[in-house]
């Protein structure tokens, strides 16, 4: 393990020299690429340097054990340092895990109402609000790409672009079926109804990754409509694009300009095509190792929101929190962090078994 880190530390020094080179500074794409690599290595190198310092201090304390006057103090410090050594080793193992190349990407967030009719659409709106508030807390930008509103509020479907640092890393485990249990406002008997929404979190595709043949596209334009189906625009500004080879259909009517709607729809289409390729690749990997860790399977029921009990339960990790009000206001960092830790531990376990 440490031989590999020594090699990475040599590379880290190389990167520091390259980033100070005027030739690299003048080449912005190369500068950004090297900066990303440098930033990715920084936490590991800093932890390793701290680890080496702790080992040196431990050696010094062991030498002091021979001194009767210093023995007690040296022993106490040694015990603290041994604990710190263990913590750092765990930290370094996590940092050495293969990094998801999509972690730093923006995401396309899709929320679709499922079983439950109007109540499901209302819950889709609640989920979008929850993620929007979480984005605000992280200083991310949220841009609605397309939305199909329900007559009684909420959304039949909403698609949004979320831009910022580490968005996919934090949101990727939100993909799946979210179930809600609550009493609808129209329920006179006070009975609890169960409905569900599906959430998909897709890493935004870069133009260079997806090459689309214009001949493979069917583009329709139409007048944008509101929640009740009425036309809200006199011009045909809404755009529907069908990718014929895959059958993927995307729509955008959020902007008044057809050109802007088309650009947004193409961005979503490229992301969906790339996601399809990733899903195929993940399925092949899963077939090889018999299971898929943290795959974000959208058919999986991942979470239940029980409003009468004020409870949220994540079924994958058995986490239950009784503060539903604050969670729905975007205070979901505890859940996000718990999921990331869980899947990191699973990856470590799989790595140890494979070794």
From Swiss-Prot:
Subcellular location: Cytoplasm
A GO CC term assigned to this protein in UniProt: cytoplasm
Description of post-translational modifications: Methylated by PrmC. Methylation increases the termination efficiency of RF1.
Keyword Protein biosynthesis in annotation: yes
InterPro entries: PCRF (IPR005139), Pep_chain_release_fac_I (IPR000352), Pep_chain_release_fac_I_sf (IPR045853), Prokaryotic/Mito_RF (IPR050057), RF-1 (IPR004373)
Cited Gene3D superfamilies: 3.30.160.20, 3.30.70.1660, 6.10.140.1950
UniProt main location, coarse: cytoplasm
Family recorded in the similarity comment: Belongs to the prokaryotic/mitochondrial release factor family.
Matches recorded under HAMAP family: Rel_fac_1
Protein name, per record: Peptide chain release factor 1
Gene giving rise to this polypeptide: prfA
